[in-house]
From Swiss-Prot:
GO terms for biological process: translation. Keywords: Ribonucleoprotein, Ribosomal protein. One of its GO terms (cellular component) is cytosolic large ribosomal subunit. This is Large ribosomal subunit protein bL27.
Length: 88
């Protein structure tokens, strides 16, 4: 049995497509309802006030407001702080 590889054969050349995970909206940023805040695998960040969690653990805004990161019982939590109604 020959132990030389055939010409131009290679064992390399495979890699999975990047999943584009991470924080998409940072602390203090204004967001609208439905905007994705964090894409993650597992719950590195937990949903807080006005934040929902999708089936793939994605966190998204339920209401418009400012993004706020906090810790609660040693968990990293993401909240949306609603903007105060401005009366003209």
């Amino acid at each position: 049995m020959a132990h030389k590889k055939g010409a131009s054969s290679s064992n390399n050349g495979r890699d999975s497509e990047s999943k584009r995970l991470g924080v998409k909206r940072f602390g203090g940023q204004q967001v609208k309802a439905g905007e994705i805040l964090i894409r993650q695998r597992g719950t590195s960040f937990h949903p807080g006030e006005n934040v929902g969690r999708g089936g793939d653990d994605t966190l998204f805004a339920l209401k418009a407001g400012a993004v706020q990161f906090a810790t609660k019982r040693r968990r990293r939590v993401v909240n949306i702080v609603e903007n105060e109604a401005v009366e003209a």
